[in-house]
Amino acid sequence: LRNEEISMNARFSPSLMCMDLTRFREQIEAMNASASFYHVDIMDGSYVKNITLSPFFIENLRKITDVPIDVHLMVNHPEDIIPMCIDAGADIISFHPETANNKIFRLLTQIKEAGRRCGVVLNPATPADSIREYAHLLDKVTVMSVDPGFAGQKFIPETLNKIRQLIAMRETHGYHYLTEIDGSCNARTFKQIAASGVDVFIVGTSGLFNLDDDVAQAWQKMEQIFAQETAAA
Protein backbone atom coordinates (compact mmCIF):
# COMPACT_ATOMS: atom_id res chain seq x y z
CA LEU A 1 0.00 0.00 0.00
CA ARG A 2 1.10 3.54 -0.69
CA ASN A 3 1.25 5.75 2.39
CA GLU A 4 -1.81 7.78 1.44
CA GLU A 5 -3.76 4.53 1.05
CA ILE A 6 -2.67 3.38 4.51
CA SER A 7 -3.85 6.71 5.88
CA MET A 8 -7.20 6.57 4.09
CA ASN A 9 -7.82 2.91 4.96
CA ALA A 10 -6.88 3.15 8.64
CA ARG A 11 -9.71 2.28 11.00
CA PHE A 12 -9.74 3.82 14.45
CA SER A 13 -11.48 2.44 17.52
CA PRO A 14 -11.56 4.82 20.50
CA SER A 15 -11.00 3.12 23.85
CA LEU A 16 -13.89 4.39 25.92
CA MET A 17 -12.25 3.71 29.29
CA CYS A 18 -10.11 6.74 28.35
CA MET A 19 -13.00 9.10 27.52
CA ASP A 20 -14.40 11.78 29.84
CA LEU A 21 -17.43 10.02 31.32
CA THR A 22 -18.79 13.32 32.65
CA ARG A 23 -19.32 14.21 28.96
CA PHE A 24 -20.50 10.81 27.79
CA ARG A 25 -23.23 11.77 25.30
CA GLU A 26 -21.34 14.81 23.97
CA GLN A 27 -18.16 12.84 23.24
CA ILE A 28 -19.93 9.83 21.71
CA GLU A 29 -22.03 12.03 19.43
CA ALA A 30 -18.87 13.87 18.36
CA MET A 31 -17.18 10.58 17.37
CA ASN A 32 -20.16 8.74 15.85
CA ALA A 33 -19.41 9.89 12.30
CA SER A 34 -15.70 8.97 12.45
CA ALA A 35 -15.19 5.92 14.65
CA SER A 36 -15.06 2.50 12.96
CA PHE A 37 -15.74 0.77 16.28
CA TYR A 38 -16.07 1.68 19.96
CA HIS A 39 -13.68 -0.32 22.14
CA VAL A 40 -15.18 -1.21 25.53
CA ASP A 41 -12.87 -2.78 28.12
CA ILE A 42 -14.50 -4.93 30.78
CA MET A 43 -12.16 -6.00 33.59
CA ASP A 44 -12.99 -8.06 36.66
CA GLY A 45 -10.27 -6.96 39.09
CA SER A 46 -8.96 -10.54 39.06
CA TYR A 47 -7.57 -11.37 35.58
CA VAL A 48 -6.14 -7.83 35.67
CA LYS A 49 -5.93 -5.64 38.76
CA ASN A 50 -8.33 -3.01 37.50
CA ILE A 51 -12.10 -2.60 37.12
CA THR A 52 -13.40 -0.48 34.24
CA LEU A 53 -16.56 -0.57 32.10
CA SER A 54 -19.51 -2.96 32.22
CA PRO A 55 -22.50 -4.42 30.35
CA PHE A 56 -24.52 -1.56 31.90
CA PHE A 57 -22.19 0.88 30.10
CA ILE A 58 -22.74 -0.99 26.80
CA GLU A 59 -26.51 -0.76 27.27
CA ASN A 60 -26.32 3.03 27.63
CA LEU A 61 -23.83 3.40 24.77
CA ARG A 62 -26.13 1.38 22.49
CA LYS A 63 -28.89 3.98 22.98
CA ILE A 64 -26.82 6.76 21.39
CA THR A 65 -24.79 5.07 18.65
CA ASP A 66 -25.00 2.75 15.65
CA VAL A 67 -21.20 2.35 15.59
CA PRO A 68 -20.26 -1.31 16.23
CA ILE A 69 -19.53 -1.86 19.93
CA ASP A 70 -16.42 -3.98 20.31
CA VAL A 71 -16.06 -5.54 23.77
CA HIS A 72 -12.71 -6.68 25.18
CA LEU A 73 -13.19 -9.04 28.12
CA MET A 74 -10.26 -9.07 30.55
CA VAL A 75 -11.98 -11.45 32.95
CA ASN A 76 -11.27 -14.91 34.36
CA HIS A 77 -14.73 -16.25 33.52
CA PRO A 78 -15.79 -14.87 30.12
CA GLU A 79 -18.67 -17.37 30.00
CA ASP A 80 -20.38 -15.39 32.79
CA ILE A 81 -20.07 -12.01 31.04
CA ILE A 82 -20.65 -12.93 27.37
CA PRO A 83 -24.47 -13.37 27.71
CA MET A 84 -24.69 -10.03 29.55
CA CYS A 85 -22.77 -8.30 26.74
CA ILE A 86 -24.99 -9.89 24.10
CA ASP A 87 -28.12 -8.74 25.93
CA ALA A 88 -26.68 -5.23 26.33
CA GLY A 89 -26.18 -4.85 22.56
CA ALA A 90 -22.50 -5.62 21.92
CA ASP A 91 -21.63 -6.31 18.27
CA ILE A 92 -18.21 -7.93 18.70
CA ILE A 93 -17.00 -9.81 21.78
CA SER A 94 -13.37 -10.82 22.33
CA PHE A 95 -11.72 -12.63 25.21
CA HIS A 96 -8.23 -13.85 26.15
CA PRO A 97 -7.78 -17.52 25.13
CA GLU A 98 -5.92 -18.27 28.38
CA THR A 99 -9.16 -17.63 30.28
CA ALA A 100 -11.13 -20.19 28.24
CA ASN A 101 -8.83 -23.05 27.20
CA ASN A 102 -11.39 -25.80 27.87
CA LYS A 103 -14.30 -23.95 26.27
CA ILE A 104 -12.98 -21.76 23.45
CA PHE A 105 -15.09 -23.42 20.74
CA ARG A 106 -18.19 -23.30 22.94
CA LEU A 107 -17.77 -19.58 23.64
CA LEU A 108 -17.00 -18.62 20.03
CA THR A 109 -20.04 -20.61 18.88
CA GLN A 110 -22.23 -19.01 21.56
CA ILE A 111 -21.26 -15.52 20.35
CA LYS A 112 -21.80 -16.40 16.68
CA GLU A 113 -25.15 -18.11 17.31
CA ALA A 114 -26.35 -14.88 18.94
CA GLY A 115 -25.63 -13.14 15.62
CA ARG A 116 -22.56 -11.30 16.92
CA ARG A 117 -18.94 -11.30 15.81
CA CYS A 118 -16.25 -12.98 17.89
CA GLY A 119 -12.57 -12.49 18.51
CA VAL A 120 -9.64 -13.27 20.74
CA VAL A 121 -7.04 -11.01 22.33
CA LEU A 122 -3.40 -12.08 22.41
CA ASN A 123 -1.16 -10.86 25.22
CA PRO A 124 2.35 -9.67 24.26
CA ALA A 125 3.85 -13.06 25.19
CA THR A 126 1.15 -15.19 23.49
CA PRO A 127 2.31 -16.46 20.06
CA ALA A 128 0.30 -15.86 16.88
CA ASP A 129 0.11 -19.54 15.96
CA SER A 130 -1.64 -20.37 19.24
CA ILE A 131 -4.96 -19.57 17.51
CA ARG A 132 -4.52 -21.93 14.56
CA GLU A 133 -7.07 -24.56 15.74
CA TYR A 134 -9.94 -22.04 15.71
CA ALA A 135 -8.66 -19.17 13.53
CA HIS A 136 -11.29 -19.97 10.88
CA LEU A 137 -14.03 -18.99 13.36
CA LEU A 138 -12.59 -15.60 14.27
CA ASP A 139 -13.81 -12.23 13.03
CA LYS A 140 -11.06 -10.30 14.80
CA VAL A 141 -7.70 -10.89 16.43
CA THR A 142 -6.48 -8.16 18.78
CA VAL A 143 -2.80 -7.96 19.64
CA MET A 144 -1.94 -6.32 22.96
CA SER A 145 1.09 -4.06 22.46
CA VAL A 146 1.24 -3.46 26.22
CA ASP A 147 0.61 -5.91 29.06
CA PRO A 148 -3.16 -5.76 29.74
CA GLY A 149 -4.89 -3.93 32.55
CA PHE A 150 -3.95 -0.27 32.58
CA ALA A 151 -3.88 2.67 30.15
CA GLY A 152 -0.71 4.66 29.48
CA GLN A 153 1.90 1.87 29.42
CA LYS A 154 5.04 1.70 27.28
CA PHE A 155 4.69 0.23 23.78
CA ILE A 156 6.23 -3.24 23.22
CA PRO A 157 7.65 -3.18 19.64
CA GLU A 158 8.14 -6.97 19.51
CA THR A 159 4.36 -7.31 19.15
CA LEU A 160 4.44 -5.87 15.61
CA ASN A 161 5.96 -9.08 14.28
CA LYS A 162 2.89 -10.91 15.62
CA ILE A 163 0.64 -8.65 13.51
CA ARG A 164 2.69 -9.57 10.43
CA GLN A 165 2.44 -13.27 11.29
CA LEU A 166 -1.35 -13.02 11.72
CA ILE A 167 -1.70 -11.28 8.35
CA ALA A 168 0.49 -13.94 6.69
CA MET A 169 -1.63 -16.70 8.29
CA ARG A 170 -4.80 -14.99 7.07
CA GLU A 171 -3.48 -14.80 3.50
CA THR A 172 -2.13 -18.37 3.49
CA HIS A 173 -5.25 -20.03 4.89
CA GLY A 174 -8.00 -17.68 3.69
CA TYR A 175 -9.08 -16.61 7.17
CA HIS A 176 -11.37 -13.58 7.39
CA TYR A 177 -10.40 -11.97 10.71
CA LEU A 178 -9.47 -8.31 11.08
CA THR A 179 -6.22 -7.56 12.90
CA GLU A 180 -6.24 -4.91 15.60
CA ILE A 181 -3.62 -3.42 17.92
CA ASP A 182 -4.34 -2.32 21.48
CA GLY A 183 -1.95 -0.26 23.58
CA SER A 184 -0.01 2.98 23.19
CA CYS A 185 -1.14 3.84 19.63
CA ASN A 186 -0.08 7.47 19.29
CA ALA A 187 2.20 9.93 17.48
CA ARG A 188 5.30 8.06 18.66
CA THR A 189 4.14 4.67 17.35
CA PHE A 190 1.72 5.28 14.44
CA LYS A 191 4.46 4.96 11.80
CA GLN A 192 5.81 1.58 12.91
CA ILE A 193 2.33 0.20 13.64
CA ALA A 194 1.00 1.25 10.20
CA ALA A 195 4.00 -0.44 8.57
CA SER A 196 2.90 -3.76 10.09
CA GLY A 197 -0.27 -3.66 7.95
CA VAL A 198 -2.69 -3.83 10.89
CA ASP A 199 -6.37 -3.16 10.09
CA VAL A 200 -7.62 -1.39 13.25
CA PHE A 201 -5.91 1.02 15.65
CA ILE A 202 -7.31 1.30 19.17
CA VAL A 203 -6.67 4.86 20.36
CA GLY A 204 -6.93 6.06 23.94
CA THR A 205 -5.52 8.76 26.16
CA SER A 206 -2.26 9.57 24.35
CA GLY A 207 -3.50 8.79 20.84
CA LEU A 208 -6.77 10.71 20.98
CA PHE A 209 -8.39 12.10 24.11
CA ASN A 210 -5.43 14.12 25.42
CA LEU A 211 -4.96 15.94 22.09
CA ASP A 212 -7.79 18.41 22.72
CA ASP A 213 -10.51 19.03 25.29
CA ASP A 214 -12.99 19.04 22.38
CA VAL A 215 -13.04 15.44 21.16
CA ALA A 216 -14.05 16.43 17.60
CA GLN A 217 -10.94 18.63 17.44
CA ALA A 218 -8.89 15.84 19.04
CA TRP A 219 -10.07 13.45 16.31
CA GLN A 220 -9.01 15.86 13.56
CA LYS A 221 -5.62 16.32 15.20
CA MET A 222 -5.18 12.55 15.51
CA GLU A 223 -5.93 12.06 11.81
CA GLN A 224 -3.49 14.84 10.87
CA ILE A 225 -0.76 13.36 13.07
CA PHE A 226 -1.42 9.88 11.66
CA ALA A 227 -1.26 11.17 8.07
CA GLN A 228 1.99 13.06 8.76
CA GLU A 229 3.63 10.13 10.53
CA THR A 230 2.69 7.54 7.92
CA ALA A 231 3.55 9.86 5.00
CA ALA A 232 7.08 10.24 6.35
CA ALA A 233 7.78 6.55 5.74
Q: What are the residue ranges of the model-derived segments?
A:
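Catalytic cores of alpha/beta
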Residues: Q27-I28, E79-D87, T126-L137, S184-F201
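Structural motif
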Residues: A33-S34, I64, A88, A114, ...
